[in-house]
Amino acid sequence: DFSSPEEELLHELDRQTHLQVVQPRMLSGHIQGKLLELLVRMLRPRNILEIGTFTGYSALCMAAGLEEDGVLDTVEVDDELEEFAASFFRRSPHGQKIRQHIGSALDIVPTLGYTFDLVFIDGDKREYPDYYRMLMGDGGSKVLVHSGSILIADNILWSGKIVEPVAHNDRHTQALLEFNRMIREDERVENVIVPIRDGLNLIRVK
């Protein structure tokens, strides 16, 4: 591996997630985390939104690339993960840039009062289409992104399930297929799917 090495705190977070948390594979991991950090450094956003904190790995990666006066709002529905993530945020030199929220992103995000320069979507896969509608202001709600905003949606290939026949009761895969079609057919954005890890959909608002 010729990529930059993983920071010690992130390595510990990865290890503790695997030791203590159910479904540790949901963690972004070193390569995807470094990609997120570099994208933040290159794009220089002021306001970042993350939907789906999990144990905080990706939030810390993005915060590392964020300017000192930048803010990262991260939303997690599982309150049992709150203190686990917060304990690592407190130990990071970038933790002061992170604002943690517990609850439904569909309820919390519209109350934050920002338009976002960068959004990382990694929450409930069944809600990806609703997250997108919320961000784009569909249905008459306030638009939460602007021209030039970047949206990054994780797990977009869903272990290859999106190219296989979908069971009628597989709501996760159905929602991801709907999301991918929404992006492809929406003339307000342009996108590319990057087959890193479980797939990233990189979306730019025109």
Model regions and ranges:
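S-adenosylmethionine/decaboxylated-SAM
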Residues: H30-K206
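Class I SAM-dependent transferase core
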Residues: D1-L49
